[in-house]
Amino acid sequence: MKLPKEGDFITIQSYKHDGSLHRTWRDTMVLKTTENALIGVNDHTLVTENDGRRWVTREPAIVYFHKKYWFNIIAMIRDNGVSYYCNLASPYVLDGEALKYIDYDLDVKVFSDGEKRLLDVDEYEVHKVKMAYPSDIDYILKENVKVLVDWIKHKKGPFSEAYIKIWYKRYLELKNR
């Protein structure tokens, strides 16, 4: 499949391990694609939950997906600074319909003051049994939590202030064309 290019809009779909659709984001603007990564932005993007509820994102958010890492990163740009929501998830695939990944419940939230929290551990444990997550997936996810925490600690990639400034500036340039 041809990679989307800068300024294109794509749909993002997250699934659960059992194959059920979890959440959809419509009209994510692509800022950059490479063979292994996609950087985009959601700004007042329509989100549809699996139960049909809909809502619109409140602030601009730089989104980062990679084909090697078992997480994706949402950097929410707010008046009081940047906060992050990181999903432990399968590497993404891109087809003619959408960018797709499997959401594995565990999340890491990074507040604008730098505080980190691992979220939804109970939900992960319930779904691990209910959906029969294989032990190798459990291991991979736990190892990727460590990678993610290291990225946060060392301000790597999306956790770098310069990264956010560069991609937010590029978004504003594309938006105002």
Swiss-Prot record:
<dbReference type="InterPro" id="IPR016882">
    <property type="entry name" value="SA1684"/>
</dbReference>
<dbReference type="GO" id="GO:0000287">
    <property type="term" value="F:magnesium ion binding"/>
</dbReference>
<feature type="binding site">
    <location>
        <position position="120"/>
    </location>
    <ligand>
        <name>Mg(2+) 2</name>
    </ligand>
</feature>
<feature type="binding site">
    <location>
        <position position="107"/>
    </location>
    <ligand>
        <name>Mg(2+) 1</name>
    </ligand>
</feature>
<protein>
    <recommendedName>
        <fullName>Nucleoside triphosphate/diphosphate phosphatase</fullName>
        <ecNumber>3.6.1.15</ecNumber>
        <ecNumber>3.6.1.6</ecNumber>
    </recommendedName>
</protein>
<dbReference type="GO" id="GO:0017110">
    <property type="term" value="F:nucleoside diphosphate phosphatase activity"/>
</dbReference>
<dbReference type="Pfam" id="PF04167">
    <property type="entry name" value="DUF402"/>
</dbReference>
<dbReference type="GO" id="GO:0017111">
    <property type="term" value="F:ribonucleoside triphosphate phosphatase activity"/>
</dbReference>
<dbReference type="InterPro" id="IPR007295">
    <property type="entry name" value="DUF402"/>
</dbReference>
<dbReference type="InterPro" id="IPR035930">
    <property type="entry name" value="FomD-like_sf"/>
</dbReference>
<dbReference type="InterPro" id="IPR050212">
    <property type="entry name" value="Ntdp-like"/>
</dbReference>
<feature type="binding site">
    <location>
        <position position="107"/>
    </location>
    <ligand>
        <name>Mg(2+) 2</name>
    </ligand>
</feature>
<feature type="binding site">
    <location>
        <position position="123"/>
    </location>
    <ligand>
        <name>Mg(2+) 2</name>
    </ligand>
</feature>
<feature type="binding site">
    <location>
        <position position="87"/>
    </location>
    <ligand>
        <name>Mg(2+) 1</name>
    </ligand>
</feature>
<keyword id="KW-0479">Metal-binding</keyword>
<comment type="function">
    <text>Has nucleoside phosphatase activity towards nucleoside triphosphates and nucleoside diphosphates.</text>
</comment>
<feature type="binding site">
    <location>
        <position position="105"/>
    </location>
    <ligand>
        <name>Mg(2+) 2</name>
    </ligand>
</feature>
<comment type="similarity">
    <text>Belongs to the Ntdp family.</text>
</comment>
<keyword id="KW-0378">Hydrolase</keyword>
<feature type="binding site">
    <location>
        <position position="103"/>
    </location>
    <ligand>
        <name>Mg(2+) 1</name>
    </ligand>
</feature>
<keyword id="KW-0460">Magnesium</keyword>
<feature type="active site" description="Proton donor">
    <location>
        <position position="23"/>
    </location>
</feature>
